Amino acid sequence: MRKEVLDNELAKIEKISKEFGVKKVFLFGSCLESVETANDIDIAVEGIKAKDFFKYYGRISMATDNEVDLVDLDDIREHFQKRILTKGRIIYERAV
């Protein structure tokens, strides 16, 4: 995936994240290691209501041209959560 393509996809994800009022969105995984060889976009979301998670994921899937793997940061094992928080990159943060 080209960097320009990733940036475009992340802009779409940011817009949808604003609409859903999520707290933060992190990019992690292969896109951070090597954009050119990444097959998908790994993101973690923090502060989304459980009832809205699949609707949010559906909107992202419909809006993006690349496969997106989404995890709820509040609903994953602690060691995975810590890895995302330390190695991931914040791509969206709701204004306080």
Q: Where are the language model's segments positioned?
A:
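Short hydrophobic/aromatic beta-strand micro-patches
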Residues: 44-46
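Acidic Asp/Glu-based divalent-cation binding sites
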Residues: 40-42
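Catalytic core of pol beta-like nucleotidyltransferases
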Residues: 1-26, 32-38, 48-96
